[in-house]
């Protein structure tokens, strides 16, 4: 119920869309009631509309459960939308380059000036990073 797929509980996996499969994966990760949820670029293969819906779902789940969620992403908007704390890593070797909190209310209003300020701040930090050396 938490991920909104109750009416598809008897469906076969091949009958589900990409977004539905991501919701099933999220439900499976939450089923054993972990203290923390680790997510490595969970939305990268989804279309924009499905991605936005899942952002809303994840925010709702986080607000209801209070679980710690560690999210790895290369998507600035995703970080601004979902994170309470952002940790930017340096290129190889990966080290913490910057860390800051995002103190915006939930659910996040992605049209607000404050949300856009957060995105601009993250982008400015990324642009100021030294370039990663090219592979030999």
Where are these regions (language model features)?
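Helical segment within the ABC ATPase nucleotide-binding domain
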Residues: 51-65
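Conserved H-loop
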Residues: 67-72
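Conserved beta-strand-loop-alpha-helix hinge in the C-terminal portion
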Residues: 91-121
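Hydrophobic anchor residue at the start of the ABC signature
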Residues: 26
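Catalytic Walker B motif of ABC-type/P-loop ATPase nucleotide-binding domains
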Residues: 37-40
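Conserved signature/switch motifs of ABC ATPase nucleotide-binding domains
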Residues: 11-14, 32
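Conserved ABC ATPase "signature" region
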Residues: 1-8, 60
């Amino acid at each position: 119920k938490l991920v909104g797929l109750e009416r598809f509980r008897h469906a076969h996996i091949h009958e589900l869309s990409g977004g539905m499969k991501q919701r099933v994966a999220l439900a499976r990760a939450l089923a054993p009631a972990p203290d923390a949820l680790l997510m490595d670029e969970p939305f990268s293969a989804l279309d924009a509309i499905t991605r936005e819906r899942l952002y809303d779902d994840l925010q709702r789940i986080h607000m209801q459960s209070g679980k710690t969620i560690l999210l790895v992403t290369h998507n600035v908007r995703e970080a601004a939308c979902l994170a309470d704390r952002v940790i930017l890593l340096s290129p190889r070797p990966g080290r913490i380059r910057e860390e800051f909190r995002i103190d915006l209310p939930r659910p996040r209003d992605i049209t607000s000036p404050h949300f856009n300020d957060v995105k601009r701040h993250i982008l400015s930090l990324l642009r100021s990073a030294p370039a990663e050396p090219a592979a030999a």
